Regions:
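Solvent-exposed loop/turn and edge beta-strand elements of beta-rich ligand-binding domains
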Residues: 1-372
Length: 372
């Protein structure tokens, strides 16, 4: 009896269609259509069309078409779009068809230069299409896509492997490109305007407000920190960020840069992408109170000021634009000696003291007269 049951089970197994996914270790899911996705990072609106190709490497000849994906100049930030892969309506044979899928270009093409760059995806995928005889007709029974290289062209194990090919946000059949333009270069990064020559991507200047009564040291160095949050797909090295004070230029490699400025000095940053969020902080300094005038993307001047002496001044959460970006810091000086009396108020203190002394002398004089 047991032998009969086993034989029946084997017969049913042979009669059922074999899942082509079984070779991949998954017999529960089959996919019969595929979607490719494209992510475009840009802080500057660009009309761009990206193209892809599926090169056949195994199986009878059967061409697969991957549609272009287009972004408009209003698609800024990080945007993702998907397109459905087109397979032949008729297949020559049953079996496995293997394709290598890559990105082939962008239209219009952008030439990488000193102030702009299009970072193209180097990702590569293997797409295996399984065709079976279903109802006396050859049709797709399963599609499996594996990533073999990531967007940087690397084959790291944690960034490769089988990917989702559905028409959902889980889709991993993805190519990511980034367009980056240097801040401050204007609308034509190939030919930056005169403001860029003067201010670069961002200019931070320093001065001390002085008058005849002040004894401020104009050779004193004030400490600053500039923090950067770079747009998606970029970092300090993408356009070679640098900081220049006078004849000294330093490369920036991280997300923070410290520097010192004296009265009348400035630091000019270059190589910072449009869309970089900045925070500029002047450290608290005894006897000094800070204020700043801020212009971002050549917009309206904004004032930032501290209300007390010896407090840090921070200009925060500003996003660099294509046009002029400046932070002009001014310090007001008031000397506070160990007595705690501010020198600018000393004359008033002396006047009060003299009045008090005169009052005491008058009272003493009156007492002596009364005693007589």
């Amino acid at each position: 009896m047991l032998a009969i049951v086993a034989a029946g089970a084997m017969t049913m197994g042979l009669a059922m269609p074999t899942s082509v996914f079984a070779a991949e270790g998954d017999t529960t899911t089959t996919v019969k259509e595929a979607y490719i996705s494209k992510t475009f990072n840009t802080e500057v609106g660009k009309d761009e069309t990206f193209s892809f190709t599926a090169t056949q490497v195994a199986g009878s000849t059967a061409n697969v078409t991957i549609p272009n994906i287009t972004f408009a100049d209003t698609d800024t930030g990080s945007k993702t779009k998907r397109a459905k892969v087109t397979f032949p309506e008729e297949w020559p044979d049953a079996g496995k068809y293997e394709y290598t899928v890559t990105e082939t270009g962008a239209t219009p093409a952008i030439t990488d230069g000193e102030h702009q760059k299009m970072i193209m995806s180097q990702a590569k995928y293997t797409m295996d299409v399984y065709v079976s005889n279903v109802g006396n007709k050859l049709a797709i029974s399963n599609i499996i896509v594996n990533k073999t290289k990531d967007d940087d062209g690397n084959t790291a194990q944690d960034t490769t492997g089988k990917v989702d090919i559905s028409n959902t946000d889980k889709n991993g059949f993805n190519f990511t490109n980034t367009y980056v333009q240097e801040a401050g270069t204007g609308t034509d990064p190939v030919n930056p305007g005169p403001d860029y020559t003067t201010y670069g991507s961002l200019d931070v200047s320093k001065k001390i407000k002085t008058d005849a009564a002040d004894t401020a040291d104009t050779n004193k160095e004030f400490e600053f920190t500039a923090d950067f949050t770079f747009p998606n797909g970029t970092d300090a090295t993408t356009l070679g960020a640098k900081a220049t004070i006078g004849d000294s230029t330093i490369s920036i490699t991280g997300t923070s840069h410290t520097f010192k400025l004296k009265h009348g000095q400035n630091v000019k940053f270059t190589g910072l992408p449009v869309g970089t969020k900045i925070s500029v902080t002047e450290s608290a300094t005894p006897n000094y109170k800070g204020s700043a005038e801020v212009i971002i993307n050549n917009g309206t001047k904004e004032a930032v000021a501290e209300t007390k002496y010896n407090e840090a001044l921070t200009v925060s959460d500003k996003t660099l634009g294509q046009n002029k970006n400046t932070v002009d810091v001014t310090n007001t000086y008031n000397y506070v000696p160990t007595t705690g009396i501010i020198m600018n108020t000393l004359p008033y203190v002396l006047m009060i003291a003299l009045c008090g002394a005169a009052l005491m002398a008058f009272v003493a004089f009156k007492r002596r007269r009364l005693q007589k």
